[in-house]
């Protein structure tokens, strides 16, 4: 089962999945990607 959350540390529009994933890892998540029309960074991890 995956837990999902918007990144709390990522600011601004998200255009790089790699950058998003790196920020998510500093928040304790295992992955992250840019999603949505507004391109926000969305983090995921196993829970």
Curated annotation (Swiss-Prot):
Keyword Membrane attributed: no
Keywords: Antimicrobial, Disulfide bond, Fungicide, Plant defense
UniProt KW Nuclease keyword: no
Family matches, as Pfam families: Gamma-thionin (PF00304)
Database matches in SUPFAM superfamilies: Scorpion toxin-like
Disulfide pairings: 3-47, 14-34, 20-41, 24-43
Any GO BP annotation: defense response to fungus
Annotated signal sequence range: none
Role of this protein: Plant defense peptide.
Stated family: Belongs to the DEFL family.
Name recorded for this polypeptide: Defensin Tk-AMP-D1.1
Source species: Triticum kiharae
């Amino acid at each position: 089962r995956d837990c999902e959350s918007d990144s709390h540390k990522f600011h601004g529009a998200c255009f790089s999945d790699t950058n998003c994933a790196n920020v998510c890892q500093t928040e304790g998540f295992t992955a992250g990607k840019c999603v949505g029309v507004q391109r926000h960074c969305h983090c995921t991890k196993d829970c």
